[in-house]
Amino acid sequence: TLRADAARMLVELAGDNMGLFTQELEKLAAYVGKQQQISVDDVRTLVGGWRAEQTWAMTGALRDGNLPAALVCLDKLLTAGEAPLKIVGGISYVFRKLAHATELARRGGRLNTALIEAGVHNRELPQWERYLRRLSRRRAEQLYSWLLEIDGGLKGNSRLPERLQLEHLLVRLSGRTAK
């Protein structure tokens, strides 16, 4: 069985290429064997490889307030030929959950509970809760719009170079103010 969160990650990593999606799903099925479920960790390990690890390192660096490390990860991904939209897919996979949790908390829920409901893993709850508090509610409420803006920008709605658009997104997500 493919867990819902693992399926979402697989879609983000494989993109809209059904042939690649099917190939990766078959590879995962063989990898897990008789296990009952295919997990996010299985997808990250088998499908994502080095590029996925760089993406998770980048989002972790943003979470921890380490913008320079996040920019180094971005540079490695771009230098390796990773497509900017694919990089944004990995970033969006993480930050859409945080945007959803922010909306749930805005409606009166506790942030910790909202993060769980949004799909953040229990072992990462304290770090992401600290991140959102550092970011501020006002900026956290802009997460969805930032993700939409970069998606449109990379699809031709911006004159800025792709790298600059990605770097600007990382600055925003880090909680720093772009000058």
Residue map of PLM features:
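Non-catalytic interfacial helical region
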Residues: 1-59, 151-161, 165-179
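Small-residue-rich helix-loop
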Residues: 35-139, 177-178
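C-terminal capping/gating helix-and-loop segments adjacent to ligand/active sites or protein-protein/ligand interfaces
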Residues: 127-159
